[in-house]
């Protein structure tokens, strides 16, 4: 679906919810944002490109927004189908994105010593859907400009918080912000609108600064991975909810620490009761809680 001139949203199934990639098709270069799960390049992205008379081999640049399985699991398959495309990502996420083992250990399994973490079935899913190692060509820090046409350039946005090196795009031509998971309101929902997964952020300060930066941009269109397309007023409300959630987690963390709960998993469960409850991946809230403990 074309959202703005040259900007297309590609939607694929992710269990009870969906995940989106974005295609920016210029006259000179074509840019894909994210590769999805392991098989999504061939099963989801390629069929959409075919409707435009294009193929994966026509891609010039592939920007990985951040290190999560549903955003970079298709990297190896994409590399095989588009060997000439440049693979770009935020430099701070590069090590995770390039190494499945490192991603699994440091992004998904670090919870285990605290008594929580993904189930064995979820670990199997993650290991399978990460799709195999793939090298990144260019690490980004934000502020870079990508030229798509003689009159169309987009800016890389550094959007840390959800992950250290999360990046997005700002298109001044349409005032569209491609933010993927840089802000997550008060939770990720299923297709029916039921909250499932808590917003995870590794840096509360970084995540809050990112939300405020996006608000200051005042985008006409806000484009995420797991939510509907939002225009100006809806985008503002979404960012407000994202900020309010950070403050709610902070306040619940502080209150429970002051009451004597300091171990990470019991503390996370108490915070979940205050701001949730969330029915899936509740352990990911531990990352957000831990990021607030640094200031307690």
Predicted regions and their residues:
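Residues at alpha-helix caps and immediate loop-helix transition turns in enzyme cores, especially N-
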Residues: 44-45, 74, 234-238
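C-terminal regulatory/interaction regions
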Residues: 251-296
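Short Pro/Gly-enriched beta-strand edge/turn motifs at strand-loop
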Residues: 2-8, 123-129, 149-154
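A generic structural signal for alpha->beta connector loops
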Residues: 6, 84, 136-137, 153, ...
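Conserved beta-strand hairpin/beta-sheet module of binuclear metal-dependent hydrolase folds
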Residues: 1-52, 169-182
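Divalent metal-coordination and catalytic microenvironments
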Residues: 6, 24, 34, 66, ...
